[in-house]
Amino acid sequence: MKKMTTLCAGLLFLLSSSVFAEEHLKEALEHANAAAVHGEDGDTAILIGHAKAALEQVLEASIVAKGVAKNHLNEAAKELQESIELANLGHIGSATLHAEAAVKHVKISDKYINSFVIINKP
C-alpha cells in the first residue's frame, strides 16, 4: 500500500511539474517571438523588454525541466542574455538573431516537455 501511494504521489508530481513548465514556456515563447519581431523593426528598447521577460520565464521553466528539454532551455537562456547584451550595445541585428535562436530552443524544449506529458497522462 505504501508503495502504491508513493508511486501515485511521484506520478502526480511529475505531471504537475510538466504542466508548470508548460505555462512558463508559453509565456517565454510569446516574449521571445515579440523580441525577435521588434528587433527586425529596429525597436531596441522593446526588444530588450521582451527578451528580459522571456529570459525570466525560461529560467522558471528550467527549474522543473529535465533532460533534453532542460538543455534547450539553458541554451535559450544563453541566447536571450546575449540578445540583451548586444541590444544594449546597439547591435540590433545580432541581438535579433540571438532572439530568433532562443525561439527555436524554446520550441524544441516545448516539444520534449509536451511529449513527456502525453506519455505520462493517465
PLM-predicted stretches and their roles:
Residues 1-2, 25:
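Generic cytosolic/nucleocytoplasmic N-terminal low-complexity/intrinsically disordered segments
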Residues 2-9, 14:
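Sec-dependent signal peptide recognition
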Residues 13, 17-122:
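Long, charged/polar, soluble alpha-helical segments
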